[in-house]
Amino acid sequence: MRALETIATLREYRKSLKESVGFVPTMGALHRGHQSLIERSLKENSHTIVSVFVNPTQFGANEDFSAYPRPLEKDLALCEKSGVNAVFAPKIGEMYPYEAKQRLKLYAPAFLSHSLEGAVRKGHFDGVVQVVLRLFHLTNPTRAYFGKKDAQQLLIIQHLVQDLLLDIEIAPCEIVRDSDNLALSSRNVCLNATERKQALAIPKALEKIQQAIDRGEKACEKLKKLGLEILKNLEVDYLECCNHKLEPLKTIEPANTLVLVAARVGKTRLLDNLWV
């Protein structure tokens, strides 16, 4: 496996690849959810590149960029064991050669980025677009793999590729859950035993909503009320039913509905969702 730290070495490596390339962008602290993206890329492509880069532009003023976990050696070992061909782990100066005021400004589309996560974390998706577009230019992948757990991010990346006419297939990957049904997240390590039990209300609420939909319930207000009752002991940022343009829905639209939840357990903020 190649461990690449500079754009020059990545470009040289990329030029040597003649067949399909799968790309898995990450911020490190890899877990089984990331591993499932890697495994799918390995299955569908001749070569797989993983990036490990904690992107400063997607952190807000009140979010502790310096505290984000960076177990790079552990991440490299996981990638090598999985069969990844190359890992790109650049320093900030490689990805952002100019200071902020000299940088080209890129903005995520407002209709997808200003609600839900974008309302809570203002400017977050602008930072995501900044780094993902740079990584796409550098890796020039055939396919890029994103988890469905970060549903709003996935929709924004899909729109980015379509709007900028990029020849990249975006491959959405299913949510991976732990044995207790909690969606895997790098943030889960911040939960103590008591908080972990409390956090299980999130998948339970979504499961209850799915069961109601399966029984024929289509009214979004009723479904949200059902979920919020289960989440009553958590600090809920939002529980919403939206279509794939993130427009609020009054009734469920088959194959075009997302039920999105964000809630805080102690100091840890967790996301989960249903694709209906």
Swiss-Prot record:
**Intracellular or extracellular location(s):** Cytoplasm
E.C. numbers: 6.3.2.1
Which Gene Ontology BP terms does the record give?
A: pantothenate biosynthetic process
Show the coiled coil region(s).
none
Any idea which residues are catalytic in this one? H34 (proton donor)
Q: Which domain of life is it from?
A: Bacteria
Subunit field text: Homodimer.
Which NCBIfam families does its entry note?
Answer: cyt_tran_rel (TIGR00125), panC (TIGR00018)
Protein name (record): Pantothenate synthetase
Identify the gene encoding this protein: panC
